[in-house]
Amino acid sequence: MESFILLFTNDKLLIFNFIIILLFIKSLSYIIPLIIAIAYLTLIERKIIGSIQKRKGPNIVGIFGLLQPIADGLKLLLKETSLPNSANIFIFIIAPILTFFLALCAWAIMPFNEINFYSNLNIGILYLLAISSLGVYGIIISGWASNSKYAFLGGLRSAAQIISYEVSIGLIIINVLLCSGTLNLKEIVLAQQNIWYIFPLFPLFLMFFISSLAETNRSPFDLPEAEAELVAGYNVEYSAMGFALFFLGEYTNIILISAVSTILFLAGWLPPFDIFLFNWIPNSIWFGFKTIIILVLFIWVRAAFPRYRYDQLIQLGWKIFLPLSLAWLMLTSGILLSYDGFPN
């Protein structure tokens, strides 16, 4: 028996293939639930917006419209992909794939509880910032490769918008890192066992949430795809699965930034009170519940607020959020140095 085991353990190629298969299965265990969550997030969004606007929302396909996301997915999957004659075909096809792939890569380090995560990086925050910075390239090259002035302007707007608000997001995150003393997402959550960072850093949470709206091109900052000005922006020439991949990438980033907000400010999977009833609830349920609250805020803002002008958007980022986040960074540093941590 031992010789039989050694025969296989010495076969490095077999071990390598086995590891690759395990990683593939583990990746699918993240990707498939995420795609299902995106599908039903669109249904919830349409229902909530319909309710705010005194409409019913989707209610024909299935009971209460529960099969509507499946119908929409099948429609996009079965439609013919139309390629513009004047487009750079290779880059045109690669752009939505790159956007969705980078959005998925960011989920590799997200901890849903103390033990359930794909990879526990000690520099998890830096990894997230790097991936979010790369995500804009898919949008830029899609606008350029489409050879359309509307798509190109949408890509330029998106690049300027994301770069503008990444600066303030980075400074806000530094405040959280100073308070927690770590770049590890799991340890940031555990550092909030005494107090959630949303309470001492509530103004920063508001700025982070508003900056997240701009970072994900969501209303009222959806200027890169403003229908009245740019038809549909950078994805105006896309149809079928190309459009679907951009759509999946956008909503993947929305769920991701909601999960990051939960980790940085709402103590991730930790219950609000240390009582038996709350401790009995699985940690992943708490994490999902808090993330859903942030997602509902995203949807409510889309339904309630009009779109900003582009100059107002840029001025908000550079003239208001950047100075405020810098000032709060100095304030946080001073308090932590004076009291050797948060004052009691």
From Swiss-Prot:
GO terms for cellular component: mitochondrial inner membrane. It comes from the Eukaryota. Its main location: mitochondrion. It is an enzyme of class 7 (translocase). It holds the Pfam family NADHdh. Keywords: Electron transport, Membrane, Mitochondrion, Mitochondrion inner membrane, NAD, Respiratory chain, Translocase, Transmembrane, Transmembrane helix, Transport, Ubiquinone. It is a multi-pass membrane protein. InterPro entries: NADH_UbQ_OxRdtase_su1/FPO, NADH_UbQ_OxRdtase_su1_CS. GO terms for biological process: aerobic respiration. One of its GO terms (molecular function) is NADH dehydrogenase (ubiquinone) activity. The chain crosses the membrane at residues 18-38, 58-78, 89-109, 123-143, 159-179, 195-215, 228-248, 253-273, 281-301, 316-336. PANTHER family: NADH DEHYDROGENASE SUBUNIT 1, NADH-UBIQUINONE OXIDOREDUCTASE CHAIN 1. This is NADH-ubiquinone oxidoreductase chain 1. It comes from Cyanidium caldarium (Red alga). The gene is ND1.
